[in-house]
UniProtKB/Swiss-Prot annotation:
This is Small ubiquitin-related modifier 5. One of its GO terms (cellular component) is cytoplasm. The keyword Cytoplasm applies. Residues 1-25 are annotated as: Disordered.
């Protein structure tokens, strides 16, 4: 028969032996850089959706969320992606780019 003390200590050991990469409470600091070179730092959970970071950036910079794009390693970030899914590490850089409108035919 296993005592409750043994169960608790076994549970404690399994939590301690987890690797930091799989911890749901781990956070990473990410840098968001705009086209003018201005940088902002954001701390976010590795398993939190990046929409939180993107919305916070747009609110801080007074930008319309639908008019900007966020790019990491040459690919657009989707709102429901997480830093863990994109293998982001401390101080990684996300580029914010303004979406260009237009593209219609030229009429003089």
């Amino acid at each position: 028969m296993v005592s409750s003390t043994d169960t608790i200590s076994a549970s404690f050991v399994s939590k301690k032996s987890r690797s930091p990469e799989t911890s749901p409470h781990m956070k990473v600091t990410l840098k968001v850089k705009n086209q003018q070179g201005a940088e902002d730092l954001y701390k976010i959970g590795t398993h939190a959706h990046l929409k939180k970071l993107m919305s916070a950036y747009c609110t801080k910079r007074n930008l319309d969320y639908s008019s900007v794009r966020f790019v990491y390693n040459g690919r657009e970030i989707k709102a429901r992606q997480t830093p863990a899914q994109l293998h982001m590490e401390e101080e990684d850089e996300i580029c914010m780019v303004m979406e260009l409108g237009g593209g219609g035919p030229y009429t003089p």
